[in-house]
Amino acid sequence: MARPGRLGVGIIGAGKVGAVLGAALRAAEHAVVGVSAVSEASRERAETLLPGVPVLEIQDIVERAELVVLAVPDDALGELVEGLAKLGAWQPGQLVAHTSGRYGVGILQPVRAAGAIPLALHPAMTFTGMSLDLTRLLDCTFGVTADAAMLPIAQALVVEMGAEPVAIAEADRTIYHAALAHASNHMVTLVAQASQLLREIGVELPESMLGPLLRATLENALASGESALTGPVARGDVGTVSAHAQALKEYDAGAGGDVLEAYQAMAKATARRAGNRGLLRQEQLNDINEALDSGSQPHNGLSSSEGN
């Protein structure tokens, strides 16, 4: 016997996110009535994660579904929603949820105008597009935006997929998405740069060296926040910071690299936060910034760690 409140779900976009969320909703006993898949990879993904679900045209999916999940790139979302509105595809009372981190429900105004219910359900995790993502959803948080009266519906859908909903105000969606992108996307760049440096000096498996350090650092940062801050910048060790900056300047000059710029930006941000926490005096902060900009020793020639 089917559970009450089960929906006919249509998935628009069988990319890594859409196919997995469709499978999660199906596991919660919702009926996936159709999926759109353009590329060969997306068709194969749909066949693997949503076996037996018909691959349909987008308008046919919207016509059949009580819940439409729009799992498409941010830049395509607005045009898709407006195009379907012009075709008269949206139905009164229909639930329409997009998975974009950047947008709230404002971009779904054509949906609202047709009497359908707009929801924004963004999973804060990276996806492989494979079944292992279904297990990872159990540790995932969704950024959820909806009208106040509809927020419980959005939250319930997330809980049914095994994840944790967190309400994000419409006005805060861009900051929310920027925070996640800054933490996740830029970490990949940071690891790539550090691995490149180690590989250049002969470390055969830089990932093996960095892995334990990065995992411990991440765990400490999540558990303790800025109290977990360590290293030469937080200690005011200007000599070491200066040596780092000079070495990276020389490395970038020879390799055409971009490491120094990233190191400078993050070290300056770290120094400001260390100063705000009282770990650095203003003079130390100035010397750190001078060392980062010039790669030279501070004007007094002393390591600012003295007196710490």
Residue ranges with predicted function:
Residues M1-E63:
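NAD(P)+-binding Rossmann beta1-loop-alpha1 motif at the extreme N-terminus of oxidoreductases
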Residues H30-A31, A116, A163, V203:
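Short phosphate-binding/catalytic loops that engage adenosine nucleotides
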Residues V33-A37, V96-T99, V144:
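Short, hydrophobic beta-strand segments that form beta-sheet elements in well-ordered domains
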Residues E40, E44, P54-L132:
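Rossmann-like NAD(P)(H) cofactor-binding subdomain of soluble oxidoreductases
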Residues R45-L49, V111, L132-A223, D252-G254, ...:
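Internal alpha-helical scaffold of NAD(P)-dependent oxidoreductase catalytic cores
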Residues L218-Q284:
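Interdomain hinge/lid region at the active-site interface
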Residues R272-N308:
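NAD(P)-dependent dehydrogenase/reductase Rossmann-like domain
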